[in-house]
Amino acid sequence: MNHTKQKSWPQRLLALLAAVVLCAALPAAALAEENTASIQTQVSETDEDIPWADPPQSTPETGRPDPAVPTPPPQDPATPETAQTGEHLEGYSLSLGETVTIYFYVTLPEDTPQDAAMQFTLPDSTVTQVAVADAKQMEANGKSCTAFPCQVAAKQLTDDIEARMVVNGKYGPVYTYTVKDYLNYLLEHDYPQQAKELAGTLLVYGGKAQLYFGYRTDALAGTAEPNSTANWGSYQFESSGTQTDDYYGSSLLLEPVIQIRHYFMVPDGAECTFTFAWNAGEPETELQPVDTNTRFNGKKVYYVVTPAIAFRRADAMPVVAMRQNGADLCILRYGVFSYGDMVRALAAVDESQLPLLNLLRALDDLTTAAQRYSVAG
């Protein structure tokens, strides 16, 4: 099933492949730019909090040091001297919403300033800081803790996250942990079955993301095959309105958040508005069109990008509307698995599509597990 108009090969590349090269979350001039993931620290209110994990007392199978007894990093001229900043690592938790977010829980001395921060460093040299003032204040193990969030892409579940406090210009000791460590902890200990199912499906999704993006494929988060049969026929997209032919195509963004990019043709001089709603009749959010500097059939091609889609809502069929002076030109009902249904059909005749198909199958399983976990409370 083709989700684009019949057009020349370069134009098909724009609509079909532009973002299936699955950008770094953001917006085809920019494929190279889109493949550099940006890590942010904003957490959605729709996140599902996954249970607490204590710092492991020993991890001989990974050879990792006990995070409660951090090991100072080797010093070189570019590395600041390690100081005693007074914090104590208490444990971890994970939130799964629009992103994968792991929290480092620490107790801090009472005189820790609000501009002190936890600094996170990933293997790709991404460095972020979260100030005490911006972190969550939580109770854990009967103690008042500060929970610092660190977001990672699905392909980064096996990446070492190095965390250290920065207080008054001084750098504390380094704590090293991975999201995979956390998920394995859940699977190996006494946690509800729904939490274990969610942990297992997230590991499989992370492994399929690594294979699709060609990222650290020698150390996969999960190696099992997804259970989903990719039966997505009910997700075929629907369009209505007076000018449905002005719908040009769609592409899918999977990193670092899930979004759908829709392309529309707009006549010269026309002032069109675009909106997004999770369902018809629900409150709408205005979308800002972006000029692709491409023309087709004498019209300009623009795209709009949906808001980030949480993992547990990946089976939704949101509505994007193109209007002019209040008239419905094109009302498009299209979800993640609308795109998945097209990939399934392509994979039947083109094996190169199988990594993407398997990634979407794993997402299907993860969505189901996240919904079950949410219902279980």
Feature locations, PLM:
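Sec-dependent signal peptide cleavage junction
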Residues: 24-40
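Intrinsically disordered, low-complexity proline-rich segments enriched in Ser/Thr
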Residues: 22, 57-58, 164
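Short, surface-exposed linear motifs at loops/turns and structural transition points
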Residues: 76, 80-377
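Ser/Thr/Gly/Pro-rich low-complexity, disordered linker/stalk segments of secreted
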Residues: 35-82
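N-terminal secretory signal peptides that target proteins for export/translocation
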Residues: 1-9
